[in-house]
């Protein structure tokens, strides 16, 4: 079933699992067959926005007469995550302009997005490598080449000018939406100020590489820049687009970029904050949860069995343990789940 969603005057109709499964097969253990995922969204026509106005393909920037922060809203770090592209396309078509500061809207992995196929929607996450694992200076400054790394280098000069980034993402497996703020205090403050979705999680990222929110500009002890990643819901689902739009609107209000203030009659409660204390990375090709945990699920008791990684048992390290984005098709070397404690 497809659904419709209207915002900013626009009506919307509506490969991480594959990569992990392939990894398991290469290691000699057959991963279970992936389920068939419902695709409620259609990829938007981004052709009007490809030229942009910044000198970087797919990036468009608008400056207001009044001074203010430079805010970047970024979509398509992963080419199959359509929700962010739909939100930015709607913003551009609505001719939204900031009332202060500078607003930049960017589509990152356009080449992977161009390969999206609703019959195989997980395959176009990236072409050569995950674009959200290349954001350390050594990799960006090094000699290695890939389509995603080359594109990150194209985008980097814009990243180096922005004050705040909201990176729009979605998830393959069922999970409550959340904001990820990395390890920086400024990014934590920005995520709490955005406030929607109502869960903020601080973490150190993945063993496989650095995310955009881990880029040194946003994590350095000095400076003012901050970056937040919203995981707005499942890929290709209409409510995910609605959550992205809510997060974008909240950030623009926080930046003072919209004429109208937020609706104080519907002000949500303050978000909960949790900090990841342990990243579970699969060490074998036989990692398996004992049941299909949902992201955002809180496990009441310390010592609860969560998974087996070969012969090793994975158990909760404390009471009220938050499950952050469990991946149910995990190959060796990939993040299986993050365990977090509320504070």
Report residues per predicted region:
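Structured catalytic-domain cores with a bias toward divalent-metal coordination
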Residues: 2-343
